[in-house]
Amino acid sequence: MNRIYYIGGSPCAGKSTTAEILSKKYDLYYFKVDDFLDGYQEKAALKGRPICRKITEMSSEQIWMRDPVLQCEEEFLFYQEVFEYALADLKQLPCKNGIITEGAAYVPQLMKQAGIPDSRYMAITPTEEFQISHFRKRKFVPYVLEGCRDKEKAFENWMGRDVLFAKEVRKQCRQYQYYSIINDGSLGIDELVSRTAVHFGFCD
């Protein structure tokens, strides 16, 4: 049985960078769940999962002009619908030293339901200010919002969704007693990696 280490949280918190560094340092297989979400969404839509089917049929305008509260609620429902596919893929990965995987898909409630112990899961979320300032620098943002008539409002809604998502993740971590780090930008990547390594029990 593979040893799998999960990093959940919300976007723009440092999850990917942390996982990449740890995968190289400890020779772990790195599984970035975001790279597979489109495929999972297609599978779930074909199975009639309502949120995945709905999103598949929506335009960028329809997706990003929704109220942030609704976007956040449906984001959690989306991850519920695709979660099984991520777990199935992880079971198929061979790796002698273990697997480190990260993504917002690893929602605390879903991890608890799947029986993932607190020693194998943690979440990293950003503060609102850190999230928005860094998201504005990301090159893919214009492509995601392509097709939206009011791109600034669409971006505002997107950020609102992720702020709400991060708050709910932190709430669930407290509820299920999972380790959680809040990144406000003052935490250097070395410190973030170090705290994650200590939590997972990695040894130099």
Predicted region positions:
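ATP-dependent small-molecule kinase phosphotransfer cores
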Residues: 39-98, 105
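ATP-binding Walker
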Residues: 12-13
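Walker A/P-loop
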Residues: 16
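Hydrophobic anchor at the beta1->P-loop junction of P-loop NTPases
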Residues: 7
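NTP-dependent small-molecule kinase module
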Residues: 164-204
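Short glycine-/polar-rich loops that comprise or flank the Walker A/P-loop
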Residues: 115-120, 176-177
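Short beta-strand-centered segment that lines the nucleotide-binding/catalytic pocket of NTP-utilizing
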Residues: 28-44
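A glycine- and Lys/Arg-enriched "phosphate-lid" helix/loop adjacent to the NTP-binding pocket
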Residues: 118-165
